[in-house]
Amino acid sequence: MIKEITAKYNAEQIEKKVTQFWEDSDAYRKTRERRKTGKRLFFVDGPPYTTGHIHLGTAWNKIIKDTILRYYSMNNRYILERPGWDMHGLPIEVRVEGVLGFKSKKDIESFGVENFIEKCKEFAITQKQAMTEQFQRLGVWMQWPEPYMTLKDDYIEAAWWTLKQAHEKDLLEVGKRSVNWCPRCETAIADSEVEYSERTDPSIYVKFKVKGEENTFIVIWTTTPWTIPANVAVAVHPAYEYSKFRAIRQDGSEEILIAATELIKNVLKQGRYADFKVLETMLGEELTKLEYESPVGDLVPIQNEIKHGVYLADFVTVENTGCVHIAPGHGMDDFNLGVKHKLPILCPVGSNGAYTEEAGEYAGKNVREANPIVIEDLKARNRLLAEGTVTHRYGHCWRCKTPIIYLATEQWFLKITEIKEKMLEEIDAVDWYPDWAGSARFRTWVEGARDWCISRQRYWGIPLPVWKCKKCGKLEVIGTKAELLEKAGLSGDIELHRPYVDRVTVPCECGGEKKRVEDVFDVWFDSAVASWATLKFPQTHDQFDEWWPADFVTEGHDQTRGWFYSQLGASMVGFGRAPYKSVLMHGFTLDAGGKKMSKSLGNVVSPLDIIDRLGADTLRAYVLSSSAPWEDLKYNLEEVETVHRSINILWNVFRFPLPYMALDNFDPMQVSLDSVKDALREEDRWILSRAQSVIKAVNEAMSGYLLHKAVREILEFALEDLSRWYIQLIRPRTWTEADDPDKLAAYCVLYEVYVTITKLISPFMPYLAEEMYQNLIRNVDPNAPESVHMCDWPKVNDTYLDPELEVAMDTVRSIVEAASNARQKAGRKLRWPVSRIIVSPESEAAAKAVNRLGSVLMDQTNSKAIVLTGVGKSWDELGLEVIPDPGKIGPVFKKDAGRVIPALQKVEGFTLKKAFAETGEFELTLADGTTVPVTSGMANFKETLPEGTASAESDAGLVYVDANLTPELEAEGYAREVIRRLQDMRKELDLVVDENIRVSVRIEAEKVLALVETLKDLIAEEVRADVFDLGSSIEVSGTLVKDWDVEGTAMKMGIAKK
């Protein structure tokens, strides 16, 4: 049977209880099994790194996923979703290095690669378990015992298989290119891994001496002085106009400079020149005949072996000088230009960011520390035209935050540029939420994509499955562990991590030995193969053939350049199509001011702290309802607490009828809604219709992943329609006899609505939904599904839908609100009845609503009658005040205006208005008995209220409240005041609903006592008083005795259990 619940919502208690129930009943597995005959839905979880505690962003991400999957499950989708864990790469290595106190790769090598690998493995697995428990506390349902983990050999094989596909399709390439490089981690990093932030760097203008021309210099600008020792060329734009001009200093000294004509003034300003004279102009293409000298040739001997020339490039812009310093070893554009013109790819910098021997005098110096040294050397050689600083957005390593540099190194690449057009076609075939996430944001990123550098010079990652012969140089790409063991002639098993796999060699046809290249995969390649790796492909094709590609994925908007992109690239290589059918892009979590959360700013919020204080359902409801999923979520504690209060109200909504239902032994299995249909009131039909409308609205919202709208619809329904309206309407019906059809109708309707709302909230607030389901449904129907999450999603019952009634009720609620405002103006509390409410409707629909729901209107306005005027008609008891217009009267009557105005004010308003309407004028009798004609423009009119009334506007029209008291109304008002206080005292004693009491009330004011005595029986009935002593001098006693001030009248009240 239905049982009472605790008075207060206790999230911690409920969540522990429900979690235990889920575990004991094996609810997750049974829920999935229950949907085996449904349409399949394959979801791929974007794997978080196992680096420690979850944060608000990862919590929001998992909550979105869980909510959508629960919704799909209830809509009979058979779901496959394994949680994923990214357990390789720099995110893990950097954390382990921190634990071990390592500063560089040398520390790792000294410690031993195998030891380091084992530490990384141990760290990743330990953190995975901790984070799993944290996600489970959010109420997230996934196959937690069977996650996909990127460190597992079967997962690694999926990456190997994909790379072999790339090799076989000629989409794998090895070569020297200038790539993003982290000097601390000593590895290449992908474009998508570069994080940009503000940084201040040197800004210098350098003069390159033109060979064969006296005192003539090409002027370049750079923010990386450290790259000057690697300079091999200057680039200019072929179509820009350049000038050779004489620049004159204050002391009369001069030199000839070359720069873009448009930028001469900037160059003069930077160099602090006093004057100039243009000697000649030419297009950029005419400068290619020039050669120049390195400004540091005496310090970097290799520079003297290079022929420095001027070359054309479209990437040159009209900024600074229009001449660009080219160092092919330290920039992608520079590198490409160098390759095009067969220039030396000079890269005198090592993996740790220090100059090599090729840098001559600079060898051994860190490039960042070398900037001021290079500047001083340029200054000493009169090659520095100007120096300053610039603050700009600069790339940093995504994990250790070190500023990146560009190095020309040998790397492995996927030829994304060769499949880019097909990738763009596939983007159009995917459903994107919102649409612009794919059509604009993602498309733009892919359009600008370069070949993907997939190799990393690190340790803890998926090893590149490339074996190279030391003798003949032949390459072999291995696709699986079985293939490797077979080709290596091994019979046992091996682990596919470094250094274990590094020890495996493969015989070469030339008689030599193939050894694995030392690089590991870019960690983004790990997660790129998730959609087939989680299906155990390529070891088995069964699940892959049944489920792939993914029906749905969702991640943050940074993944347009991350996981969405890497998945698409890898899938195009492996299968020639996108690995997902639909994608939801969500936003970032920020603080209330819109700033990114970071430990340094002290604005990080732990989702676990929120759960500990307010519960998981509160956190879920907050992040889901705060904004559209694709907008950034600005965390605001006050808003979280508001959501928590809403859930408390929802709890109270559920709690309200339970004591009465339990007391009456109400059994919804015995009394159906259909059996009491003849006893349904209009308000019952209305709430049933509203419930259907909410189902429709939530379905519509969920179809477009508008999770915020879905949650808001449900909470608004619970708070506004149920708590603040319907429950207030039916409250008196719950106090009648147990078998009263009117009461049973209210119970049945409430039960029907509660069953609906319990199911509606279940994807969003799974703990609260389960708690209520077990009490309301499972306790009365043992044949019901074991868990709310096994239930079918509510279907719209068209027989309950009545849109016209919903509109009518909205109209009535607007009138009630206006009546409340008018009461305040009249100084009459709602507890005190009024004789009548007058409504002047503006439309036939409003009048019809009042007629249809008159009883509701009377009840909620606490009035004895509802008076309805004609549509668009004024209330016939209104007065009409005449307001003379001196501006119109004065010019006509001049000195007599002082006699006309007071006489006009005394005319009965309706008479004057009628005369004006019929003839346009009125014969006005003055004080001396003479008459004068006044015209319609000389007076305005203002309606006046009868004494004791007040008015307010509503959506339906004007509403008037007659607040005049009669003795009967006054008696009822005082009676209601007494009842309220006695009920408060019952609550204070925590009495059960049906517990009878003894009451004594002393009222010394004889007039008030006489009024209250007329309704003594009503008071006794309302407060369940078997004994009720009332008088002006009686002794007041009881378990609880209190003094009260009731509308200025002193009363003493006492109550006691019978």
From Swiss-Prot:
Domain of life assignment: Archaea
Localization (cell): Cytoplasm
Protein name per the record: Isoleucine--tRNA ligase
NCBIfam families with a match to the protein in the record: ileS
UniProt motif ('HIGH' region) ranges: 48-58
GO biological-process terms attached to the record: isoleucyl-tRNA aminoacylation
Binding-site residues, ATP: K599
Enzyme kind, highest EC tier: ligase
EC number: 6.1.1.5
Catalyses which reaction(s): tRNA(Ile) + L-isoleucine + ATP = L-isoleucyl-tRNA(Ile) + AMP + diphosphate
Family of this protein: Belongs to the class-I aminoacyl-tRNA synthetase family. IleS type 2 subfamily.
Domain notes: IleRS has two distinct active sites: one for aminoacylation and one for editing. The misactivated valine is translocated from the active site to the editing site, which sterically excludes the correctly activated isoleucine. The single editing site contains two valyl binding pockets, one specific for each substrate (Val-AMP or Val-tRNA(Ile)).
Main location: cytoplasm
Subunit structure: Monomer.
Phosphoprotein among keywords: no
Record's GO cellular component terms: cytosol
High-level lineage: Archaea, Methanobacteriati, Methanobacteriota, Stenosarchaea group, Methanomicrobia
Pfam families per UniProt: Anticodon_1, DUF5915, tRNA-synt_1
UniProt short sequence motif 'KMSKS' region, positions renumbered to this chain: 596-600
InterPro entries, alphabetized: aa-tRNA-synth_I_CS, aa-tRNA-synth_Ia, Anticodon_Ile_ABEc, Ile-tRNA-ligase, Ile-tRNA-ligase_type2, M/V/L/I-tRNA-synth_anticd-bd, Rossmann-like_a/b/a_fold, tRNAsynth_Ia_anticodon-bd
Cofactor or coenzyme needed: Zn(2+)
Gene3D superfamilies, per database record: 3.30.720.200, HUPs (3.40.50.620), Isoleucyl-tRNA Synthetase, Domain 1 (1.10.730.10)
Keyword annotations: Aminoacyl-tRNA synthetase, ATP-binding, Cytoplasm, Ligase, Metal-binding, Nucleotide-binding, Protein biosynthesis, Zinc
Function: Catalyzes the attachment of isoleucine to tRNA(Ile). As IleRS can inadvertently accommodate and process structurally similar amino acids such as valine, to avoid such errors it has two additional distinct tRNA(Ile)-dependent editing activities. One activity is designated as 'pretransfer' editing and involves the hydrolysis of activated Val-AMP. The other activity is designated 'posttransfer' editing and involves deacylation of mischarged Val-tRNA(Ile).
